[in-house]
Amino acid sequence: MTSVVELFASFAVTITAAPLARSWMLRQGCVDVPNYRSSHTVPTPRGGGVACLLGLCGALVVAATNARDVPWALVAASIALSLVGYADDQTDLSSGFRLAAQVLVGATMGVTLGGGWLIPVAAFVATAVVNMVNFMDGINGITSLSMTVWGAAAWIVGVLHDVRGLQLVGVAVVGCSLGFLPWNAPSARLFLGDVGSYLFGGLVASGLLLGLSGGAPLMPLVAPLVIYAADTSAALVRRVVRGEPLLHAHREHVYQRLVSTLGITHLAASTGVAVLSAVATVTWLWCDTVISVPVTALIVVLYLASPRLLSASHLWSVDVPKGLPR
């Protein structure tokens, strides 16, 4: 029952705070203006992840009031990452500073879990996941829907294996994601910004580390991220092969090509990513490895090949409008 209240608190605070965050960002001039590498066509305020940060605080208040086990150090680290993201939204921090901050906060996560080998592991996990979520937050609804899948998986794993901190992180992620979704899809009135993608990245990293340290199986927590990992890795490999800067913004992700080339709507592409992630997750939660491995591999291959497959099948024609404006 407590999880339900935490879920409602994070959802209610996020959806209520979103218009306030939008007004604040507009006053601050924190607006994304479309350019040649954007997937949106309308200037839109970013930094809406502040509402999710407040939603997380709402869940924490409920948890503390009910004497729940709260992984305070990991949550604090996630909040610290979101503040780095907020600063980047406002002032455009250098890539070197952002990377150093991510590694430092990740290492701190490892220290709080006992140190030793967990320090480099946590530093890597936090940095990788934060950047992965940030890179993939490029069309309407993709982060909210995908993080809802991950949060649900985290809660289920936490319940099945009695990792209570993971239960809290899971429901908070679901509540914040669903609370933000109406403001970001089908057409966006507000973007998460780095403050939001860094927050979700930090919470996902925290969940992975909680599962690892708590003896829970990791694959059900990793499975919701397979599409993110595959898409990000494929985009980076393409840029390495061409000798292009890795950290420069681009429109080479699969989901971006589905929208810009095939004219699939933002929400349809985002839903497709979330559904595929959910299918992979379900197989790792309730099926044997002999089923989970090939199903996950097939999902990854089909997703990466989807622009070519859909184009060849002529299911989408060039006359289809190029997605909904962001």
Language model segments and positions:
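Short alpha-helical linear motifs
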Residues: R98, V121-F124, V169, L246-H248, ...
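"…together with the soluble PPM/PP2C metallo-phosphatase catalytic core" -> "…together
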Residues: M1-T232
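C-terminal membrane module of polytopic membrane proteins
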Residues: V259-G323
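Secondary-structure boundary/capping signal
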Residues: G116-W117, L190, P245, H266, ...
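Short, low-complexity, intrinsically disordered N-terminal peptides in bacterial proteins
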Residues: M1-A9, L315-R326
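Hydrophobic alpha-helical transmembrane segments and immediately flanking/interface helices
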Residues: D69-S82, Y86, T91-L93, R242-G243, ...
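Cytosolic, membrane-interface loops and tails of multi-pass inner-membrane proteins
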Residues: P19-P45, A234-L267, S317-L324
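Extended hydrophobic-aromatic, low-complexity segments
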Residues: G215-M219, L236, H248-A249, L267, ...
